[in-house]
Amino acid sequence: MNREVVTMSTGNTLPPALAALASPLNDAQLNQLQQTVTQLNAQQLAWVSGYFWGLSQSNALSVPHISAGQTASAASGKLTIIFASQTGNAKGVAQALLKEAQAAGIQAQLFDASDYKGKDLAKETHVIFVASTNGEGEAPDNALALHEFLKSKKAPKLPNLKYGVLGLGDSSYQFFCQTGKDFDQFLENLGAQRLVERLDADVDYQAAATEWRKQVLSILKDELTGAAAVTSVATFAVSQTAESHYSKEQPYTASLSTSQKITGRDSGKDVRHIEIDLADSGITYQPGDALGVWYENRPQLVNALLDSVGLSGHEEVQVDGETLSLHSALTHHYEITAANPQLVAQFAELAQSEKLTSLAQDKEALREYATRTQVIDVLREEKVTLSAIQLLSLLRRLTPRLYSIASSQSEVGEEVHLTVGVVEYEYEGEQRLGGASSFLAHQLEEGAPVKVFVEHNNNFKLPSDDNAPLIMVGPGTGIAPFRSFIQERENRGAAGKNWLLFGDRTFTQDFLYQVEWQKYLKSGVLNRLDVAFSRDQHEKVYVQHRLLEQAELVWQWLQEGAYFYVCGDASRMAKDVHQALITVVEQQGGLNREQAEEYVSELRKAKRYQRDVY
């Protein structure tokens, strides 16, 4: 892929009339413009044209004069920012750094890790990596190729490179911020020099990331002076207009249209088909994107939490400079459902709990305990009274829940559909519910407001070639994006074959969207459907077993250029499917295990093997 200062890719071309004009833009700018306008409808294009005209009149895009023969890189160097992102958090931090660098007069450019060629690091002077970690220490899908290149013997020596790494992760996991640690080590091994110490940021990363960016910029101001690059200023403005003005920080207040249980009466699971009305928002999304949902904590849980530490909820606290009651802060701003190791260790110290202190000294036992308990369970381990400040110091800030979108806008218009598995279980005789899933399933009435935003996922997209075959593996709620894929392929009249592999517990109770799949089979949009219901026979059968059973056909489709998609559980299913795919390639391709692993790795690099796992 050509190196471009972009974060989206389409493969479309500019209208002939525009392409024929004598362009004052350089190649990078023209390519960025091309990839942006092809995403917009006529109304959006009209708005954008007016927006840029207004900017030109207000000199909002004015840049220092560059004389003939002088290049935009005439400053003492430039900053290259590379993001490795799975859910969009790293991308957001990288975009913020880009904007701040440009405002400081630093020439800066931004790259998706999948669009950056590792060998080009030898040409750089200053690079910042912002990297999230996927699953159990894996690099995000968009960074797999770069990650592999930098640890290989092909990577160039980098004695002239100065760098910084910001890692994003979740300390609940064993391999916390592993991808950031990897990039930091790779660059050090290649002879690069650290500008600043690596930051390993936890789930509530915003404040720490902001301070780290300030530290980086204070150093870069001394090292990178001169005019900001024309391409950087212009391309940032264009990329901003290509996105909806609604975001994680500024969500859209939509309304809940439908919350319908789609598992049977006797199912052990409650799975909901959710429809949300986006009318008049102007929000657009593509198959493969996710919807971020901001939720409120249940009043019953808030009250139980307050009671467990001897507080009334009327205490006043400061949240983001605003004075709120403690009850309101816990309802809207803090994570009070999922426990985490840091919470357990801090509460052990506050409560002087021998049991929890002993537990905190065993990392594996601590992690296991935090996984199976909720915040309320930890606080009830010891009967102590806390102040409001002490309680909030234990808690993480609330973060939105991301759900794979289960609809295509070409089919549903100004709606967005989700497939939500309600988290519900018992702990020591008491019911425990998930925060976001119970909010959507139980707390909201139809017509109630819900704050949402679209999180684009460029690492889980339909191929631009409508003739390409698709193999889609989506057990349980992992079926969601493939509903959007099939809707989109039908509406586009795509000729490519479609094969779906679905699995769950039982055929009669857990076959999600069964009627729809049968309709698509009958119409020919879906060419093949294989199912695995684990509890319908003595021996449990899962989707990976169906793959192995159909190994010859899987290999045939791959040889025909099929794209292979997996969505769902990262801890077991995705790993088992991955190993099954390698086995298929090994057996059917006549390769040894190492060669089969390399083949599958090449599929991922070519974006013919894409995963949306959690």
Curated annotation (Swiss-Prot):
Metabolic or biological pathway, per its Swiss-Prot or TrEMBL entry: Sulfur metabolism; hydrogen sulfide biosynthesis; hydrogen sulfide from sulfite (NADPH route): step 1/1
GO biological process: cysteine biosynthetic process; hydrogen sulfide biosynthetic process; sulfate assimilation
Binding site for FMN: 85-90, 132-135, 168-177
Enzyme Commission numbers on file: 1.8.1.2
Pfam families in UniProt: FAD_binding_1, Flavodoxin_1, NAD_binding_1
GO molecular function, one term: oxidoreductase activity
Domain FAD-binding FR-type: 249-463
Sequence similarity: Belongs to the NADPH-dependent sulphite reductase flavoprotein subunit CysJ family. In the N-terminal section; belongs to the flavodoxin family.
Protein's UniProt name: Sulfite reductase [NADPH] flavoprotein alpha-component
Source organism of the structure: Vibrio cholerae serotype O1 (strain ATCC 39315 / El Tor Inaba N16961)
